[in-house]
């Protein structure tokens, strides 16, 4: 159970692919102009990570070490092609919006990295969980960045959600404030870099506060009964 918890915590927070490893920044910065696009690509990446980790882990004993990387890429490309056709069939609007960034998941460092670092060494169940956790960590980072950019740039949230979830999702669109001219800095790549930098700073501050609390709690436990540690 502790190993399962560690895999989940590492994927979602401690070893977050976007905020700690800084992998996959090209789609992270390019696609997160809206929350819908960010969520769509994040979920697609999560599905690819889960399925590829599961497949590679299952076949790890039959994969020759000398040619393992080409085999990994072939498996990843097959899964990405299937996911691309799935999005094309059931979410065509999102497919058009994401464009080239769906097939580019094949070259995403996150996917290849987890295949080599985790799936090739661990069992199928734990590898699938690792892929799901890493994918959801990246999805959360993309969704937060996409939401911030959409709100600041357009004053809306979940604009175009029907492209991802169907026509019923039009009711999810929220207009937070009305603007006649979008704030282009937030919608263009410089805004993505600024937003990512703020998120990195925010995560660092949270980690430092959590570390300080753990240190203080450990110091209090180490003191004899009745002592407060004050001179």
Swiss-Prot record:
Compartmental location: Cell inner membrane
A Gene Ontology biological process term: electron transport chain
GO CC terms in record: plasma membrane
Pfam families xref list: Rnf-Nqr
Record-listed E.C. numbers: 7.-.-.-
Broad class of the protein's primary localization: membrane
TM helices/strands, residue ranges: 18-38, 39-59, 63-83, 86-106, 125-145, 182-202
Superkingdom of source: Bacteria
Top-level class of the enzyme under EC nomenclature: translocase
Family membership noted in the UniProt record: Belongs to the NqrDE/RnfAE family.
Name of the protein in its database record: Ion-translocating oxidoreductase complex subunit E
